[in-house]
Amino acid sequence: MSHLVKMENGQSQTIQEMLGCIERYNPDHLKTLESYVQDQAKNNTYDLEANLAVLKLYQFNPHMLNFDITYTILLKSLTSLPHTDFVMAKCLLLPQQMKDENVQTIIDLADILERADFTLFWQRAEVNRNMFRHITGFHDSIRKFVSHVVGTTFQTIRKDLLKELLGGIEDSTLESWIKRNGWKNQGQGLVIVAMQDDKIKTKNITEKIEFDNVGALMAQCL
C-alpha cells in the first residue's frame, strides 16, 4: 500500500520524500506514519528510518504517544538482528515508554537474543505469543538470525540441538532451513554447517606501487 503525505501547500509526497526534509518533524504526519508501521507488520516489510521518525515525533509530542505502535516498532527492529536497529529504537524511548510492562518484556527478549540464549527466547516467546501475533514473518525472521549465529559458531551441530535452537520446529521445516542455509546432513544426527574448505584462510596480498605515486611525498621528506 502506498502512503502519501499531504503537505500544507496541498501537494502530496511519499513517506520517503517527506523523511528527507523538515516535514519529518511535523506531528500532522504522525497518523500516516503510524499507519505505515502497521502495514509493515502486516506485509512483512521494514523501514527503519520511518519507524525511528515515529519515535522521534513521540519525543516531541508525548501527548500523542501510542504504545501499540511502540511495541510494533520495537518488535520489527528485532527482526533486523544482528543489525543494531533495536538499540537505536530503544534510545529514542520516553521514560513512560521505558516503564511500560510490555516494553520491558520486549527489551528482555532482545537481551536474550543478543546473548544467544535461543532456547529461553522461544520459551518466553510462547508465553508472550499474543504480543507479536500481528507481525507477519516474525518467527522466521528470528530463525534467520539464529541461523546466522549458528553459521558463525558451529562447524557441525547435532540435529536435535539445531531443531531446539530454531524453536522446536517440525522435521520437515528443519530440513527446509538446512537447505535454505546451504548446510548438509552428515548422518548420525549431525548437520554440517561449515565445510573444511569454507574455513577462513590467510592470503598474501601484493600491491604494486608505482614510483610516480610516492615520488612527490618522498621529495617532501628530503
Swiss-Prot record:
One of its GO terms (cellular component) is eukaryotic 48S preinitiation complex. This is Eukaryotic translation initiation factor 3 subunit K. The lineage of its organism: Eukaryota, Metazoa, Ecdysozoa, Arthropoda, Hexapoda. One of its GO terms (biological process) is translational initiation. It is found in: Cytoplasm. Disulfide bonds: none annotated. Its main location: cytoplasm. Belongs to the eIF-3 subunit K family. Residues 46-208 form the PCI domain. One of its GO terms (molecular function) is RNA binding. It comes from Drosophila melanogaster. Component of the eukaryotic translation initiation factor 3 (eIF-3) complex. The eIF-3 complex interacts with pix. Component of the eukaryotic translation initiation factor 3 (eIF-3) complex, which is involved in protein synthesis of a specialized repertoire of mRNAs and, together with other initiation factors, stimulates binding of mRNA and methionyl-tRNAi to the 40S ribosome. The eIF-3 complex specifically targets and initiates translation of a subset of mRNAs involved in cell proliferation. Keywords: Cytoplasm, Initiation factor, Protein biosynthesis. Gene3D superfamilies: ARM repeat, domain 1, Winged helix-like DNA-binding domain superfamily/Winged helix DNA-binding domain.
